[in-house]
A protein has these predicted regions:
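Short, charged low-complexity linear motifs
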Residues: 34, 87-90
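Sequence-level motif detector for i,i+2 pairs with an aromatic at +2
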Residues: 7-10, 86, 122-123
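Non-heme Fe(II)/2-oxoglutarate
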Residues: 1-81
Length: 160
């Protein structure tokens, strides 16, 4: 389903038959952590972030097949020609209340997240408006924030 946030396309999809694959993918993430315990640091604070080659692991084939289908359809919906290539994928494990991702940018690319498991009272994912200039704050240019002028928007992360 196509949504917009600040006039930027935003898709939210559910993986078919997710519950059939969920537990095996969660186990595979922990196996990946056991194989690569040092992980990588990009944006994850106090949690684990795997190396960025998770999409080459056969245990996630069903997930990345689904992601590729969504990416191709998303590109078609916005009339984007060319080949869609999944270049990086990694897993984050947030296993304590101190874990979080720092705000970061995936510029000039499609990017996404997929939640295998979401605890009760989990935090929300935040999207910040790249079109706003911080120097405009306080000038009263926007009386009522809307999807094009709000500073940020939040989505509760669903599993699957």
């Amino acid at each position: 389903m196509l949504k917009t946030a600040f006039s930027i396309p935003f898709w939210q999809e559910q993986m078919p038959n997710f519950n059939l694959h969920r537990d095996s993918m969660i186990d595979a993430v922990y196996e990946f952590r056991d194989l690569f315990p040092q992980g990588e640091y990009k944006s994850n604070h106090a949690g684990y972030q795997s190396p960025k080659n998770l999409h080459h692991n056969q245990k996630f084939q069903s997930l990345f097949d689904f992601i590729n289908l969504v990416a191709v359809e998303s590109a078609r919906q916005i009339n984007l020609d060319g080949n869609i290539v999944l270049s990086e994928a990694w897993a984050n494990i947030h296993d304590s209340r101190q874990c979080m991702n720092h705000m970061h940018i995936h510029g000039g690319v499609f990017s996404g997240c997929f939640y295998l498991k979401v605890p009760n009272k989990a935090g929300r994912i935040l999207f910040s408006n790249p079109g706003l200039n911080p120097m405009w704050q306080g000038l009263g240019l926007v009386k009522q924030p809307n999807q094009y002028t709000a500073e940020s928007t939040h989505y509760l992360p669903p599993e699957g």
